[in-house]
Amino acid sequence: MEKNYIYTSNHGYELDVTIGKFAEQANGECYIKSGDTSLLVTAVASEKPREGIDFFPLICDFQEKLYAVGKIPGGFLKREGKASDEATLISRQMDRPLRPLFPENYYNDVQVIATVLSMDEDHLPDCLSTIGASIALGTSDIPFDGPVAAVSIGYVDGDFVVFPNEEQRKKSELDLTVAGSKDAINMVEAGANELNEAQMLEAMLLAHEEIGHISDFIQDIINEVGKEKNLVEVVVASELEEKITSDFAEDIKSSIRTTDKMERGEAIFNIEEAAKEKYLEDYPESEDEIHRVIDDIMKKEVRRMISIDKIRPDGRDLKEIRPLSAEAGLLPRVHGSGLFKRGQTQVLSVTTLGSPADVQIIDGLNREEIQKRYMHQYNFPPFSVGDVKPLRAPGRREIGHGHLAERALVPVLPDASDFPYTIRVVSEVLSSNGSSSQASICGSTLSLMDAGVPIKKPVAGIAMGLIKEEDSISILTDIQGLEDHLGDMDFKVAGTRDGITALQMDMKISGITREVLEESLANAKEARMQILDLIEATIEKPREDISDYAPRLFTIDIDPEKVRDVIGSGGKTINKIIDETGVTIETEDDGHITVASTDGASGKKAIEMIRAIVTDPQVGDVYTGKVTRIMNFGAFIEIAIGKEGLLHISQIDHARTDKVEDVLAVGDEVTVKVTEIDKQGRINLSRKALLEKPEREDKEDYKNNSKAEAWPADEDPRNK
């Protein structure tokens, strides 16, 4: 039965939710609208749990349908294909707040699909997809401890804005998305233009206040039309669990204190193998349980060490950063490189500079194509964690980490008008023991500065963690992999000395107070300053010049009406410039032209050729042109593409010239001066006006060259 619900916010937006209209065979569904943006969100679970796994198999998919904005997909097939990076990021944004709210021992496959059916630019579908997923799951029979909601916050002209529209987003200093329940924030994603910690905290709390109102709205829907939830089998401590704990707990606790990740992993592996050898005969098919029990013992001990002993597995105190090292300029032929190491996490970042023609063009749910001039790509090869796996295309995690690092650095990049290069940074994770995304931010700062990119300020990132045991809360600075896996929070903060540029948080528990968030941000700032000290000690400021192997860019702004003159009929003119100089040329409708060359001389020559095309010659101007034709009375010189002037025989030299061919040949370059432009626009040139006049030994030799000789108009080929 179809039901409709409407939520009207005090902040000026509306949610329109319909249940029971679409997708009747899904476990749960909702049709959600805001403005002209509408999505169908479905939730489906398998009937039985998947066997042999120790993780929850949740899949969240965000589908962009170009018909939603009245566009036909490009390409030969004319249909949507692989998910775009934007769709992947929104899929992750749905997954992160939903995943912690399923029962711990629930192993049924669950798929949530959010399909964009219609969209306007003022109402983005990202937060709507999370809200819709919460409604679909909450009203279904799938076990889910919701509701949750998501809210976006902007910062425009000194004020925070809830769900900013398109115009406000263009001016906003903040792009913040917060998701959570009425009682807790459990996901944050943000890019900011150096907002301080107090401003970020205020924005997060404003978002959470609105999340509470939306959660109440969702709960009302669930109370009215929600299905009875399926039961989840409760796992009780088994006899085997008690035996493993009794026989191996002390060995496990001892191995946890091994500071080296690989040695610790080997020690735990040996314990697990010993447990299997001891128990599998009496407890066949219990391999998964043995692994789970050992993991639980590790988790309890790590959390006890941190909460009670205030010491971490690698011996650090709670606020201590792992050993740091940094290096810039280590690769000789690339445009820029930086190596950053924090503990056993090591990232190599490499910068490549390209012309404006190298921008990434993105065609998605936008009225117009998006052109990205800065790209940050993150790679996580299997050897970085000692694994053997086939190499695949970048997954969701790689795309998400690359996006986070990209957001962190965008605010400090120079304007395109000051530095017109397209910039690509690739971060290669060479070794990972936690916080590799933040290490990629630090490595990228080093790499950009080494490449001569005039970034406004260096950027660094740090990952914070948290362990909450009853009333004891321990905030951790610079978490390693084990603390991330067994802890309650992963809070990544990146920024400059003056403020935050990117932030990402995933919280596994509720009950985190304002004071805890405040302290986490303060500790992150303190750590960030230490890392920035190292970066600035490694490379104090961006290199004065770009690499010898990077393209040289030259720009010129011309009258937009003359762009067609530079291009020429069928591209003839611009192709001639390219052929003669070996450059690449990018023209824009507003008259801005960019020339890219492998050396400065070619670029400067191309710019001069363009300037000559669009500039009307004036008497007194000097050009270096090419001889195109020779006549008995002089030579025609191309001073610019499509512009010729006559160099009369009397203007070739101070001495008498009997034959033009004695001095010039077709194809010769000659420097000439404009001496006259007649009423018909014909250009007369002189070479001798630029030559030093010698002392005359034979006055007759110079007599006939004292002035240009006239010729009948009908003999001038420029009139034919």
What are these regions (language model features)?
Residues A26-Q111, V116-H123, E189, L330, ...:
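Glycine-rich, flexible beta-strand/loop modules in the N-terminal catalytic cores of phosphate-handling
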Residues M1-S46, D54, K229, E233-E369, ...:
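Extended amphipathic alpha-helical scaffolds
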Residues G28-C30, H123-D141, A328-T351, N433-V453, ...:
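Conserved phosphate/anionic-ligand binding catalytic regions in large, soluble enzymes, centered on
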Residues E104-V110, D145-P147, I214-V232, M262, ...:
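Flexible, glycine/charged-enriched surface loops at secondary-structure junctions
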Residues P551-L553, P560-K720:
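Single-stranded RNA-binding regions, centering on S1/OB-family and related RNA-binding modules
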